[in-house]
Structures are given as structure tokens and as C-alpha cells.
């Protein structure tokens, strides 16, 4: 569905008021999504102007010939209006085919105490990132970074790519095997739930032995129903030599695809884990997902581009703020007397022998 008042977006507004938006029906609230074209992946088909004779016939057939010279009608005919731009973006032949095939999913969610199926649709950064991944793989780039700001749906992006890359590799007569790698138990549970709610079969791996066993299995799925599958791996308890596997069975028809969640955080460039992950299957596709900028001190020792390759796609904070998904940070001057009070409190805490880390942990910061 498209909703438009034919006005330009007012960036940074949490509740969309002005602009042209797309959405899918929902059990309760309908979420309006912005759409902005990506210069690297432009829409392929453009609308053609019709001749005046055809225009008159259409207006006459709909008993609307009277509006032909009205200012509103003349404005609405222009191809660069917000409404016509989004219609061209979403409903051009190839783009619509892609959306219908890959961009819509039913998600099982609990609403007001009852299980219901919500219909979700890709946000535009997810759509272009999905196209970017296939384009980069086509160009021979088997590893790269998706930098999407926090809260932009990186787990959902991985789900969409299970669908898209399955068909992509099917054309090459290759069967992909998908892994989503996290570094905490709670993230394993959360990601597994999100994938399962979208209809994927989920296998969980919590130990290095299970991971090694999984890598040695010939075949892409573990279920006997043929349902698309993803293996969610928690590396929190893995040792540095977790997957130094020399005799891994190699199936020429299997393509392993690793999605590394929060890639800025979990993979020590000085350790062996990442090297072993790559060495376990040198032909594997590695897609690093992150949305957190590195501190300058950390970035000096930790060049994510060196570890994971170039950026496949980027969706930064400024765009997320403009789209209303991220609130803008507002810096305010702290009053002088409040600074003094805080200093006194910190001095008292220091005198009591409590460190700052303990305070942060206790407050859940």
C-alpha cells in the first residue's frame, strides 16, 4: 500500500505527516516506511509520457475531462512529484517483482495476549543491501561489511537474504548453507526467535564441538521437510582454536554463508577465531553486520575493512534520523552547581571504594 499527500518528507519526524510512504496491512498499527532511491541501484524502468490524444481518451472514459486544466492535475502529472517518484520506485516491473518475491514476510507475534501473524515488508535500506550483497558476490567479493545503524533490522536483513541468496545460488546449481553468528546467549535466543517467527527452521550451536560437527555435515539443512534453515551459533564460550579444522569434508555443491552479528565487537583481530572461521572454508561468504562506530583508539588496532573487506552497503545515523527510526541526540549544557554536586557524589563513591564499572553494571548501563 502507498499513502501520499504528494509533499516532500519532513526529515526527523517520528510520526510521519508529510510525504509518500509505503506499508503493509497489520493486525493493529500500520507502520509507514520512507522510501529513498539508492544511486548505486537505480530503478530500471521509467514511466513514459503518453500523448495528448491518449490522455484525453482516458479522462473522457472516466468522466474527468473537466480536471485537465486544473493546477492540481497539472502538478500531479509531473514525474518528479513525491507520489509519482514512489510509484515509479515501487511498481516498476523488476522492482515490484523483487518486492513480491523477497520483501514481504508473515511474522508470528503475540498481540494482546493472542498469537497473530503480522505482515512485514522490507525497509528500503534492507532492499538495497540485499541487492548489494548479490552484486558484490557476482563481482567475486566473498566478504564485506553491511553498516546499518542500530535498530535498522539486521536480523531481518539476514532472514531476507536467506530467501534471496537461496534463489541466487540455485541458478548456479549450488545449495547455500546459512549461519548467523552471535557472541552472547541472550542474542542467540533473540535471533533464533526472530528467525523462527519468520518461518525458518533454526538449529542452535552453543559449543565448538557442535560447530565442528556441523561444518563436517555434508548437506545444507538438517530438517527432513525441506524448510529453509539457518544455524545460529553462539561463540561466547568458544576457545581461540574453536574451529581449527583440517579435515573438513568439502562438498562442491555447498556454499556456506556466514552473517557475523555485531562484527565490531566480537572478533579480535589478534586472536585466532576469525582466521579459523575463514580457514574452515575459504570459499565461504562472510557478511559482517554492524551499526556501531569504533572509538578512535580502538580503530587504530582494529580496522574492520581490513578484517571483513569493503562496505557492501551503508545506512548511517543521519539517514536513520531523517527516516524517524533514530532520535537525534541533543547536547545540553550542565549547570555549574549540578557539576559540583556530581563531583561531591563521585568523591564520596571513590572514598567508599566503589569503582565506576560497578556503578555502571548495577544501573544496567
Range-by-range predicted roles:
Residues 1-177, 186, 190-201, 236, ...:
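ATP-dependent helicase/translocase motor core
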Residues 2-4, 231-234, 285-290:
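Structural recognition of the conserved hydrophobic beta-strand(s) that form the central parallel beta-sheet
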Residues 76, 299-365:
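Interdomain helical connector at the RecA1-RecA2 junction of SF1/SF2 helicase-like NTPases
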Residues 138-142, 170-171, 223-227, 242-257, ...:
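Short basic/glycine-enriched coil/helix segment immediately N-terminal to the Walker B
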Residues 185, 205-217, 235-240:
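Conserved helicase motor
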Residues 187, 237, 264-268, 294-295:
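Residues immediately C-terminal
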Residues 210-231, 249:
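Conserved motor-coupling elements within RecA-like helicase/translocase cores
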Residues 249-285:
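SF2 helicase catalytic motif II
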